[in-house]
């Protein structure tokens, strides 16, 4: 029996098993086996040749955003509208066959936008170019899931399932579980909170399935067996996702209102160029970027060339971005902006910068 058949059998077994106290250990084991087989499926084949058209794109700009969706939901049209890149767009499926990059220039930042080929159902099993599409998606900072508003619910659940099966966790945080395999001493299990979904016995069963008999486990939050399996496997990607419902000109106002109220969702129409500005604002928020402007002594700030950093970046991060040796020569910095009580304020390396702050660095 091949890996795909084993995965299919386990999925059927999970679907027909009623969830209750008596079956929780059985379900936990099935989920551990399923995660193990899926990990094997995603490993690149040793016999596979490396010939063929290049697919991955070199990372550039200040952030990377992956456009994911089924064929013909409007990804190529969106890329053409947002960037200067022309991605071939047509009203039939599978127009885009390779990964097309573009750059959005917004608030001084260059955001790389990747138009990935349309995902079809079963992409995780390698159908179409699904596996390559998902591999590129794992390298992004944010995923934009493009959905056709006329069939958005069906597409959304299918795409979420595909991404979940390859270890991409959308709009979730990494489980707060400390896990460390050891050479001996058995399994040490502790928790700082009351656990309602995992027990010591279930944790041991899951670890034994992965041939781990000596480990230290500490739960700092109430997690499910699936989340614990994610911690053991360790190659999961936790990523913010923006659900974008396109073609809202083809549905009723009531349906548009319902979709717009969903969490992490934006409604747009690429054909009529509706709501694209709001989508850019939301994307900026999800990327959590800040613009920092520099100032030389006795001169005006340079507002033409911003330093783009992650939200919560310190003065030390700014120093490293300017020059790697600057932090070692640092004496103090003068900062103007919302991060200070008064302007300018003299600060040290640990000071946290805010969006559109101005900084002047003084060396020793």
UniProtKB/Swiss-Prot annotation:
Location in or out of the cell: Nucleus; Cytoplasm
GO terms under cellular component: cytoplasm; cytosol; intracellular membrane-bounded organelle; membrane; nucleoplasm; nucleus
Modifications made to the protein after synthesis: Polyubiquitinated.
Gene3D superfamilies: 3.10.20.30, 6.10.140.1070
GO terms assigned for molecular function: GTP binding; GTPase activity; metal ion binding; RNA binding
CDD domains referenced in this protein's UniProt entry, alphabetically: DRG, TGS_DRG2
Gene Ontology biological-process entries: cytoplasmic translation; signal transduction
EC number: 3.6.5.-
Keyword vocabulary terms for this entry: Cytoplasm, GTP-binding, Hydrolase, Hydroxylation, Magnesium, Metal-binding, Nucleotide-binding, Nucleus, Ubl conjugation
Enzyme class per UniProt: hydrolase
InterPro entries: Beta-grasp_dom_sf, DRG, G_OBG, GTP-bd, GTP-binding_2, GTP1-OBG_CS, P-loop_NTPase, Small_GTP-bd
Cofactor(s) essential for the protein: Mg(2+)
Domain annotation TGS: ranges: 288-363
Major localisation: nucleus
Ranges for domain OBG-type G: 63-288
Expression tissues: Highest levels in skeletal muscle, heart and kidney. Low levels in colon, thymus, spleen, small intestine, lung and Leukocytes.
Binding site for Mg(2+): 76, 96
Subunit structure: Interacts with RWDD1; this interaction confers protection to polyubiquitination and proteolytic degradation. Interacts with JMJD7; this interaction is direct.
Entry's family note: Belongs to the TRAFAC class OBG-HflX-like GTPase superfamily. OBG GTPase family.
Listed name of the protein: Developmentally-regulated GTP-binding protein 2
Native species: Homo sapiens (Human)
